[in-house]
């Protein structure tokens, strides 16, 4: 390659043939800029120290030499150079050919033209102009009156380019695993994905730190896994194993006013963190609540094998706990104040995947739940009653068995998470009796128990009389509620009567109203309440069974659907655990770490009173029950999957779902919200860390 390569304007290309023809082809662009730059500066590495080359067509830097442009013979006419250049460099999206950005130039002594590829020369020149802040760069530009070229904006401002604030890197022990192990583990596939998402931090979750948190309180505890980062979680579906560490960045929202310190410690695999100051006996580092810059910690991969399987949870754990309590010196009448800690993650340099698998292949372990609740409250339906959710009720104890599922896809109930008609065979208890029992069912999750059968029992012992309502009550008044069959569910029903004689009229299908509940039969006309459901405790009453047309019928095939409820008292349906039915055990949730369990409420229509309703308590949104039943999700038993609920007035609070499927909030009372509400996944946090909120709550001053 020649000693100097000069990119020339037409004013300097006097030795070239056919100057006029080239000018006609490229127009007045040529000659307006006289910029002399050494092509070494444009196309060759900065540290190149070779000053000459005796074989330019077998260049040592073939990739660089190729990027200069397309080679043409010195004797080719200019129009051929132009046409071949356009033909070999493609077309723009609108169909026009990619014309050369600059005229052809020559490498002295080679007798060849070089027409630069589109963008190559401009990219090189702009990169040099972009370094105009370097005083060592010298360029000569012919600034004629009609020449305007700007490489900067018109407005004032500094020349510094500011990147994302990375934060302070904290060095801690133990040292991450050697990269040689990673290389060996991924030897069959090599380095996997090397993309830009490996260089920046992605949001993981947010942790609330309040002035009520005592020393030793664990605010953040997560085991090393690809689930810590959204991009790693997505790519993990393509691989079977992984290895390597993860960088975690913490940003405290404090303004320099708060006082207090947090401790970060690495817990080795096989050790379970406990909420105690004794955890501070592990090697740890401290960071202050007044820290204005982010702090970065690395969770090292400590392992005894070459790689981890995707369901491996026995890994290194990063724990953030309170070292000194948070103090707000300006706190007065407020019971507490808090700040937020934002947690972001990115893979460390040694992180890699291995053992490729097809994306559709299912692994034994579960996935991280991100779609358990619909984003808009208009799509929320209760898992006890099929109407739309319209509120929340915080309780010290929440319970439900039927249609309630946990993160292991198990339920202690007898119904699937879908509202379907109940198909059963009914038979009279006795020839002269008023009640029917269920002798067979078409659809059942538990043998003998119809799918969708109600899960509450009657309040007291009940004797059938005439099966009708007490019409002396003209309007809804709890104090004078004398209706029969309190606690029964009103069922719309289509029956086919099994004939007991040759009377064909008895086989006709009829539409009628039935009453259904759970109870133990004392005699043919009396039932007692029970909180245990069996195939012998399913009670049905037909309001019209005393008529002469149906008195002879003893067996029916019935298809029923829920229509309403016969009111008991002012208590919501499902609020009394002694009246909630279960097969054996009743799943329950209690207050935990300052977080309170919550019921989802909706309305159930009560019988006889026109357009009257009562409240019904639900342990889950129906879609949550469906997702948990159909999928195996991964959530540690000591953690909450946190969603942020925002109403139309921008008030918000965090709602966490634990491993048992119950929901929690961090406030003891939820005020009236402006519906519709929106849900957004906020991440995973420890169950004992108080959930954040920003809602208007009533306060009492003593």
UniProtKB/Swiss-Prot annotation:
Protein name per Swiss-Prot or TrEMBL: Capsid protein VP1
Organism domain of life: Viruses
Known InterPro entries for this protein?
Calicivirus_coat (IPR004005), Rhv-like (IPR033703), Viral_coat (IPR029053)
Q: What GO terms fall under cellular component here?
A: host cell cytoplasm; T=3 icosahedral viral capsid
Q: Where is this site: Cleavage?
A: 152-153
The protein's matches in SUPFAM superfamilies, at most eight in alphabetical order, are given as:
Positive stranded ssRNA viruses
Tell me which species this is from: San Miguel sea lion virus serotype 1
Give the family, as the similarity comment puts it: Belongs to the caliciviridae capsid protein family.
Asked if the Swiss-Prot or TrEMBL record annotates the protein with the keyword Membrane, the reply is: no
Give the quaternary structure: Homodimer. Homomultimer. Interacts with the minor capsid protein VP2. May bind to VP3 and Vpg proteins.
UniProt keyword terms in alphabetical order: Capsid protein, Host cytoplasm, T=3 icosahedral capsid protein, Virion
Q: What does this protein do?
A: Capsid protein self assembles to form an icosahedral capsid with a T=3 symmetry, about 38 nm in diameter, and consisting of 180 capsid proteins. A smaller form of capsid with a diameter of 23 nm might be capsid proteins assembled as icosahedron with T=1 symmetry. The capsid encapsulates the genomic RNA and is decorated with VP2 proteins.
CDD domains per UniProt? rhv_like
